[in-house]
């Protein structure tokens, strides 16, 4: 997998296919495999780039210069500069949408179209922020994601009632279990705190181009409920698509629906 050095650390990324560039921004705690169905579908006619978050997949630790989601947006722009890519179509899910929207606000000339999936540009509600911070403290103290926490954290990402014996669930649970103490303390926990203490940028959303922006959300997304997506689509003035039979990682829970929606949107905008 290709690598770029950004802010002194190796950032690994997928680069597959040719044509207009589509950048896929991943969720926290997921590596490039989160987008496997979309990489396959989109790379038939687009150049698909998937940067792996710091401390995830093969990417290096969170650079010391990373203090906010704006820094994640800036680091992605640095990657695009290194690759001599002037304009992109950006699809961001969860934190991928959080930094993705900030990138679009920071450098609108670089964004051809924008899809915000299962994400929210407001601040984290105080109750859930405190809850996630309590989980981070437990992980930090243990130097691991303790066994009892695995089946607390993993279900957050899926629709209620997912088969916990399914490969999708078990593979993700195993990945959580496999994080080293060093990776958790250097990258995963600090990045999580950065994400969930983010600033509210809802008032800036009307600056986004409604004609080239789409909001999508899993109908059964627990951490980022559809009401948040409805609020954002209203502020932007863009279309909203609810994804049936899907929770937070909608790209994996209903990949055929997501692929069709993305291909249709990109055909009209990319």
Language model segments and positions:
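Flexible "cap/lid" loop of the alpha/beta hydrolase fold
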Residues: 105, 112-144
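Conserved alpha/beta-hydrolase catalytic His-Asp/Glu region
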Residues: 125-130, 145-207
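Active-site loop/oxyanion-hole signature of alpha/beta-hydrolase fold enzymes
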Residues: 40, 49-92, 260
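Conserved HGGG/HGGXW glycine-rich cap/lid loop of the alpha/beta-hydrolase fold
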Residues: 9-65
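Conserved alpha/beta-hydrolase "acid-adjacent" motif
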Residues: 222-228
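Gly/Ala-rich beta-loop-alpha elbow adjacent to hydrolase catalytic centers
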Residues: 92, 96, 100
């Amino acid at each position: 997998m290709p690598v770029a050095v950004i802010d002194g650390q190796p950032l690994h990324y997928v680069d597959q296919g040719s044509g207009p560039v589509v950048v896929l921004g991943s969720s926290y705690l997921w590596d490039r495999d989160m987008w496997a169905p979309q990489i396959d579908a989109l790379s038939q006619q687009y150049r698909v780039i998937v940067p792996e978050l710091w401390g995830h997949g093969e990417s290096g630790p969170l650079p010391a210069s990373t203090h906010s989601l704006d820094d994640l947006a800036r680091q992605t722009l640095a990657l695009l500069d290194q690759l001599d890519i002037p304009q992109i179509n950006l699809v961001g899910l969860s934190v991928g949408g959080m930094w993705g929207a900030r990138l679009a606000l920071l450098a609108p000339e670089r964004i051809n179209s924008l899809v915000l999936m299962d994400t929210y540009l407001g601040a984290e509600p105080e109750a859930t922020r405190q809850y996630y911070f309590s989980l981070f403290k437990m992980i930090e103290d243990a130097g691991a994601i303790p066994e009892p926490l695995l089946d607390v954290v993993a279900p957050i990402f899926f629709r209620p009632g997912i088969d916990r014996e399914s490969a999708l669930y078990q593979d993700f649970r195993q990945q959580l279990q496999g994080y080293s103490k060093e990776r958790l303390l250097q990258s995963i926990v600090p990045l999580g705190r950065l994400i969930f203490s983010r600033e509210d940028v809802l008032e800036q959303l009307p600056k986004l181009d409604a004609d080239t922006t789409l909001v999508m959300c899993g109908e059964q997304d627990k951490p980022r409920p559809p009401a948040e997506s409805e609020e954002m689509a209203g502020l932007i003035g863009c279309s909203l698509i609810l994804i049936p039979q899907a929770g937070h990682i909608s790209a994996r829970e209903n990949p055929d629906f997501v692929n069709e929606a993305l291909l249709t949107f990109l055909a009209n905008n990319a």
